């Protein structure tokens, strides 16, 4: 699930969603950035790179999604990435992985 909005609100909402899933006994993963990585409370938190580093985000996305599969997480939450050059391709891949579920905050 993608969560879009102002960074502090996104972090807070993802942490709420993580707690809800964990209370149900589910393992949860979060795709974060270097800037927000330490602010999450999920079972598996992975930084995709610096928010402004489009190349790193694109390079790490598939690897991170495979890692979550390997870890058998039940739910994945991700920050949204609006980057001008390759951002649309990144967002299209994330939207597909999220089953087009987007939560605006």
Predicted features and spans:
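Short, flexible loop segments at boundaries between secondary-structure elements
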Residues: 102-105
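A C-terminal functional module that forms or caps the active site or interfaces directly
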Residues: 1-99
């Amino acid at each position: 699930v993608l969560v879009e909005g102002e960074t502090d609100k996104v972090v807070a909402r993802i942490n709420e969603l993580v707690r809800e899933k964990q209370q149900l006994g589910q393992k949860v993963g979060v795709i974060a950035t270097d800037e927000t990585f330490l602010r999450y409370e999920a079972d598996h938190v992975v930084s995709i790179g610096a928010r402004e580093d489009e190349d790193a985000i694109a390079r790490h996305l598939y690897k991170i999604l495979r890692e979550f599969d390997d870890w058998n997480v039940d739910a994945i939450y991700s920050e949204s990435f609006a980057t001008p050059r390759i951002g649309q391709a990144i967002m299209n891949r994330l939207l597909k992985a999220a089953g087009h579920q987007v939560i605006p905050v």
